[in-house]
Amino acid sequence: MIEGDVISVCKPALGARIFNIWTALKGEEVDVYRLSGFSKVRRDDILVFNFPYSEWNQWDENMKMNISNYYVKRCVAVPGDTLFIHDGIYMIGDGNVLAGNIESQKRIMKFNPDNIPDDQYYTLPFDSIVRWNIREFGPFYIPGKNDSIPMNRTNYLLYKKIIVWEQGEEVLFQDEKVYLGNKELDGYRFKSNYYFMSGDNSMNSVDSRFWGLIPEDFIVGKATLVITSRSRDTGKIRWNRVFKRIE
């Protein structure tokens, strides 16, 4: 997809969402109920979802469903996957499964890291010890509903915002222990499914490498078709893109 595309989104595929839109527009948390769909999210699906923060560049705050801001990205990892990036290439599990736009990912290795600004090179969890970046990242387990993880410093850094969003309480790391409110956490069981989203232009995409995983509740549906496309520069319709299938 390119700028100027107008796309159709298939909501019944995953099941349409039902929630109080007026409450969501006020910036308040809402319960989301999803109708039964006829398919699940799969790797390489192009998804439309609500951005997980109130502002584009404020992903140091707590997660929330931004009902006014929609993103379109490729899903490269689903619940149960372990994702890692080596030499810029997205890999699943033991590395036998590649994910995303590989040709775009290969171009990352052509750039000298010294010439890339830190805020574009280093990724979550933005930690001086867990020093992940756009070339070397992970392993990062993508949790599903009822999956459990042990709580340690690394998992605290990786999953803190998810836990806060699910529980509505702050999570702290103190004296080598993790606390949810005043309660010590030895482990955590997730309440939802999560997905890793990536832009096809890997070098210039702001995606799950930076702002983290997307809860299933935030997903609107699958992008399926370019209905029409108009150049912002000329105002003319790009007829070669009209009714083009999104892949």
What are these regions (language model features)?
Residues 2-247:
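Soluble "head" domains of membrane/secretory-pathway proteins
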